[in-house]
């Protein structure tokens, strides 16, 4: 079930991106300012995107509560694959063959990584020392990367801020898992008497704000692969650091899983770089005219 919930979360995220972006560029009057905002909030497609986003959060929470962080977060990479399918079937974009091959390789290597690494274990009650050390280290790393990303060329800024954003999203996943545990243990009322729900609210808000800044400072072809690749790497590190999750002790299996993970990262980068740069539908094919005899 955790794997199914994680895939549903990835699909819902892809649905959110495609629907809201399609709605935002589909205004026939090209309104600006408050008129554009009014157009969006009255657009059923844009509102449906928010429903999809809420569904993504619920599915991710269910996956993290019932499964391992080191399994759930890497599976969210499939958002790019789902988005590609939606763009082809719904928006009717023409997708290059290399992009489809990259998507297929992403799925295969992801499955190979999870099956060969054999993630297991996990401590449902991490120690205070683990929480403080992990959160302080990741928060400090986010701050350093964000400060370095304030200046420089657009590509450099997009890469640095993208890395900072992805680390924050990994931290958000950790807090989601902790919050669901307190919810089940203490109920809705008791959840608000414990810190994870507030840590989630603050980190989630900061992650979204930093994500918006990242999207505006540099090319998406740089920031998107960084965010998608760094998030599962940091999540796996935090799964071991905080929740004491373990992996196979067999050297061969670990070697294969590491190679599969590296190949997955490469395929994700290729997918992001070769996918259509916009959500605009591909123009219809025009058959060449037959010259008169």
Residue locations for each model-derived region?
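Polytopic alpha-helical membrane proteins, predominantly small-molecule transporters/carriers
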Residues: 1-293
């Amino acid at each position: 079930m955790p794997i199914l919930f994680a895939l549903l979360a990835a699909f819902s995220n892809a649905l959110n991106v495609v629907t809201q972006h399609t709605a935002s560029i589909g205004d026939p009057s090209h309104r600006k300012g408050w008129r554009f905002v009014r157009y969006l909030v009255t657009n059923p497609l844009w509102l449906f995107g928010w429903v999809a986003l809420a569904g993504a959060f619920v599915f991710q929470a269910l996956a993290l509560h019932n499964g391992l962080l080191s399994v759930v977060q890497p599976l969210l990479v499939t958002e790019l694959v789902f988005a590609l399918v939606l763009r082809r079937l719904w928006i009717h974009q023409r997708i290059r063959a290399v992009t489809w091959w990259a998507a297929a390789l992403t799925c295969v290597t992801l499955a190979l990584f999870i099956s060969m690494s054999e993630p297991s274990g996990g401590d449902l009650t991490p120690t205070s020392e683990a929480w403080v050390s992990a959160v302080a280290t990741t928060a400090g790393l986010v701050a350093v990367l964000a400060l370095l990303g304030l200046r420089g060329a657009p590509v450099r800024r997009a890469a640095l801020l993208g890395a900072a954003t992805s680390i924050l999203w990994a931290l958000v996943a950790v807090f989601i898992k902790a919050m669901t545990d307190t919810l089940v243990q203490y109920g809705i009322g008791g959840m608000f008497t414990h810190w994870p729900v507030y840590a989630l609210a603050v980190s989630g808000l900061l992650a979204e704000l930093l994500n918006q800044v990242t999207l505006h400072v540099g090319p998406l072809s740089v920031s998107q692969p960084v965010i998608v690749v760094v998030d599962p790497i940091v999540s796996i590190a935090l799964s071991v650091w905080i929740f004491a999750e373990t992996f196979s002790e067999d050297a061969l299996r670990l070697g294969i899983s590491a190679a599969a993970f590296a190949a997955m990262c490469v395929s994700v980068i290729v997918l992001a770089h070769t996918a259509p740069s916009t959500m605009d539908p591909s123009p219809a094919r025009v058959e060449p005219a037959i010259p008169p005899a």
